[in-house]
């Protein structure tokens, strides 16, 4: 593992369960579920039957979902500062997020990094982590530029809390993590998954990692 993964995360990794499901999951309202995080220990990822390792990259839902859900695991283990929720407090819209914000641009201009981030402060927090580490510095700046004079200050204020939390609580520098994630995403299509050694991948210490 890269050094950034092991800093302060030993206990989290030891108890983490990664559960992979081939099909999609759906909520009672018909919304598709890409992943879930439970009790600070279990991540479930769905629709793996449709994952093509030759085309997966940092912009696909899989990379973002993994970091989104692991962000929840971290928050469930050690909560983030309560002042984060105050920045966009009255603007969270729960399950109406995709109805109210039909485009990423409209969400950005309201101060949310994605439409889904407007659901609740917990989703907002982990969406900032997931999108930051899966986008280049140039792409992130483009999003902030789109957010404009109203949305940008809110996103930047929230991200400062996110970044400080990750560094002070878990000793993870998000800039360093982003470099690793983008590198791995670029390498993913060239990996030979058929030749993975079962002896290496089935051991408890490797279970649930993203190598």
Label each region the model flagged.
Residues 2-13:
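Single conserved hydrophobic/aromatic residue that forms the stacking wall/gate
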Residues 10-11, 35-37:
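A generic structural signal for short, solvent-exposed coil/turn residues
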Residues 11, 15-16, 30:
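Intrinsically disordered low-complexity regions specifically enriched for long asparagine
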Residues 16-22:
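Extended hydrophobic secondary-structure segments that form protein cores and membrane-embedded regions
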Residues 23, 27-28, 34-36, 42-159, ...:
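Active-site-flanking segments in enzyme catalytic domains
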């Amino acid at each position: 593992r890269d050094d950034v993964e092991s800093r302060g995360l030993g206990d989290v990794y030891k108890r983490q369960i990664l559960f992979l499901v081939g099909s999609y999951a759906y909520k009672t309202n018909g919304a598709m579920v890409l992943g879930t995080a439970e009790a600070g220990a279990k991540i479930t990822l769905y629709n793996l039957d449709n994952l093509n390792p030759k085309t997966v990259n940092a912009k696909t839902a899989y990379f973002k979902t993994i970091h989104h859900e692991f962000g929840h695991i971290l928050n469930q283990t050690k909560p983030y500062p309560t002042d984060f929720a105050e920045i966009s407090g009255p603007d969270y819209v729960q399950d109406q997020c995709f109805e109210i914000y039909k485009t990423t641009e409209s969400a950005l201009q309201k101060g949310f990094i994605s439409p889904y981030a407007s659901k609740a402060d917990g989703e907002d927090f982990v969406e900032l982590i997931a999108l930051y580490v899966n986008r280049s510095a140039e792409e992130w700046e483009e999003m902030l530029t789109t957010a404009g004079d109203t949305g940008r200050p809110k996103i930047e204020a929230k991200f400062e809390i996110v970044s400080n939390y990750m560094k002070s609580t878990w000793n993870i520098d998000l800039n360093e993590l982003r470099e690793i994630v983008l590198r791995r995403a670029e390498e993913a299509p060239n990996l030979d998954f058929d030749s993975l050694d079962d002896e290496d991948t089935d051991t408890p210490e490797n279970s649930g990692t993203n190598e």
